[in-house]
Design a protein with these regions (language model features):
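Residue-level preference for hydrophobic side chains embedded in well-ordered alpha helices
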Residues: 24, 28, 32, 53, ...
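Sigma70-family region 2
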Residues: 14, 52-68, 87
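Short, charged helix-capping/linker segments at alpha-helix termini
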Residues: 14-23, 33-52
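N-terminal module of bacterial RNA polymerase sigma factors
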Residues: 1-30
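Short linear capping/connector segments at secondary-structure termini
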Residues: 52, 95-97
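Arg/Lys-rich amphipathic alpha helix in sigma70-family domain 2
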Residues: 63, 74-95
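Hydrophobic side chains within well-formed alpha-helices
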Residues: 9, 20-21, 49, 68, ...
Length: 97
């Protein structure tokens, strides 16, 4: 039932109902931020990545067969590990010079 409501809200957002986004954001923001924080171990980065996740999810259609919850966590995980990898590359480059 919850996943049906999330998809309904997401589809309403795509149809122009901005309040639907606010409901989804309020429902998932803290959960996603906590999830990302456990990966990146930095509160400010987790907050920034969480914002990026919501922007990405709301600008790109969810793939057929995915629930909103699955998709947002998938994007969050990807963005968090991308951040870690980017920092790792920067560190490696700085150490070379």
């Amino acid at each position: 039932m919850e996943k049906d409501l999330d998809i309904k809200l997401y589809n309403e957002y795509l149809d122009g109902e901005k309040g639907a986004f606010e409901l989804l954001y309020n429902k998932y923001k803290d959960k996603i931020q906590y999830f990302v924080y456990n990966i990146v171990k930095d509160y400010q980065k987790a907050e920034d990545i969480t914002q990026d996740v919501f922007v990405y999810v709301m600008q790109n259609k969810i793939k057929e067969g995915y629930t909103f919850k699955y998709y947002i966590y998938l994007v969050a995980k990807s963005r968090a590990y991308n951040q870690i990898n980017m920092e790792k590359r920067r560190t490696e480059i700085n150490e070379e010079y």
